[in-house]
């Protein structure tokens, strides 16, 4: 059954939980953002390669971090003391996220900032991932944010600084190794990642 939702109205996570259809949505400061139904092949391949490298690294090193793929709800409360469902206005589903603090995990996903987020660009998500989500992740305290562009065959990496702002970002292109700050000792090869 198709839900009729007012895209100009603000909603909370409590509202979000009542939407019983199969559409993928996110909430940004209470406003609905519809997500693309299915990724393109290059998006799916990049997701698989990055996620697999991270999981294998964590398993080999007996790490405490966990890797999650969309759809996996990450809730960002505006105030750490206001975590009730009807007080949360931002819920996103990153392509990949790493959570190293298990106290942030519950049956519905992650409450608070993951340690790392990876968003893989598509034509429909370009502006959204580079602007709105960048701001959400920065303000929410995500320490490492990767924006992966299969089309441009590059990765832009943002690291959260002590002042709570992301650095200017480092672009990795060509045949290079991209260090994963969250998982010290792991790097991802851009050549292997974007190989046709």
Language model features with spans:
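Gly/Pro/Ser/Thr-rich low-complexity, intrinsically disordered segments predominantly at protein N-termini
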Residues: 1-196
């Amino acid at each position: 059954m198709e839900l009729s939702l007012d895209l100009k109205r603000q909603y909370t996570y409590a509202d979000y939980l009542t939407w019983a259809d199969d559409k993928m949505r996110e909430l940004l400061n209470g406003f609905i953002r519809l997500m693309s139904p299915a990724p393109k092949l290059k998006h799916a391949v990049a997701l698989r390669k990055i996620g697999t490298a991270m999981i294998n690294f964590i398993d080999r090193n007996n790490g405490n971090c966990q890797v999650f793929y969309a759809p996996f709800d990450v809730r960002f409360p505006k105030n750490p003391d206001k975590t009730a469902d009807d007080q949360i206005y931002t819920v996103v589903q990153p392509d990949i996220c790493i959570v190293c603090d298990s106290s942030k995990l519950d049956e519905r996903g992650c409450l608070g900032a993951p340690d790392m987020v990876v968003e893989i660009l598509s034509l429909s998500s370009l502006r959204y991932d580079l602007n709105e989500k960048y701001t959400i992740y920065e303000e929410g305290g995500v320490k490492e944010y990767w924006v992966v562009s299969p089309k441009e065959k590059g990765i832009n990496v943002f690291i959260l600084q002590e002042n709570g702002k992301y650095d200017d970002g480092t672009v990795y292109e060509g045949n290079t190794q991209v260090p994963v700050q969250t998982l010290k000792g792991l790097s991802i090869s851009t050549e292997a990642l974007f190989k046709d």
